[in-house]
UniProtKB/Swiss-Prot annotation:
Main location: cytoplasm
Gene Ontology terms: biological process: L-histidine biosynthetic process
Protein's name in the database: ATP phosphoribosyltransferase
Major enzyme class: transferase
């Protein structure tokens, strides 16, 4: 049995057509189903529907053989115990710093609000900048507006939400897309099956990219 961990939302919507190219189609709509384990048209493949931030954990611990996770999630929650054989080139966005439009660069210790605490620590450590990291789980744009933080670090797609709140994207930390990740033990135990799936998905990605 091959188990693939996915999260609902944009990643799921963009991944399903790629899996379909490999003949893997869920037997019911994951967006509408309440089930968290969904069979597919291939008897030996099932989907696990989990939180986006939990995908690396399920795969690393072997509860899933493969998964699809954003590079931002892998950077924050760790992808060290996983193989990352393929960039699926879906759910693309940017991980950036942002601040109030026209605000001067703060001097001294910087206050940064983000849910990407580990990424923020590494980023500013590399710059030699002293920072106080304030962990938030949402509505990052609010933090600079009410003087909770000087800057935020967040995923930026169009930038419209930032601009609507008087903020502007500033420094690019990483370009983000969704990656296929594989459990290391599974890759050894089911190498032929998993490699075949990786190759098929790679062809689908390349074909879509050329088109």
């Amino acid at each position: 049995m091959l188990t693939i961990a996915l999260s609902k939302g944009r990643i799921l919507d963009d991944t399903l057509p790629l899996l379909a190219e490999a003949g893997i189609v869920p037997t019911e709509n994951p967006d509408k189903s309440r089930k968290l384990i969904i069979p597919t048209t291939q008897d030996d493949v099932r989907l696990l529907i989990v939180r986006a931030t939990d995908v690396p954990t399920y795969v690393e611990h072997g509860a899933a053989d493969l998964g699809v996770a954003g590079k931002d999630v892998l950077m924050e929650y760790g992808g060290q115990g996983l193989y990352e054989p393929l960039d699926l080139q879906i759910a693309r966005c940017k991980l950036m710093t942002a601040g109030v439009v026209g605000a001067p660069e703060p001097k001294g210790r910087l206050r940064v609000a983000t849910k990407f605490v580990n990424v923020a620590k590494r980023y500013y450590a590399e710059q030699g900048r002293q920072v106080d990291i304030i962990k938030l789980y949402g509505s990052m744009e609010l933090a600079p507006l009410i003087n909770l933080a000087d800057k935020i670090i967040d995923v930026v797609d169009t930038g419209n939400t930032l601009r609507a709140n008087g903020l502007e994207p500033q420094d690019l930390i990483a370009t983000i897309s969704s990656r296929l990740v594989v459990n290391k033990a599974s890759m050894k135990m089911q190498h032929a099956r998993i490699q075949s799936l990786i190759d098929t998905l790679r062809q689908a990605v390349e074909s879509r990219h050329r088109g």
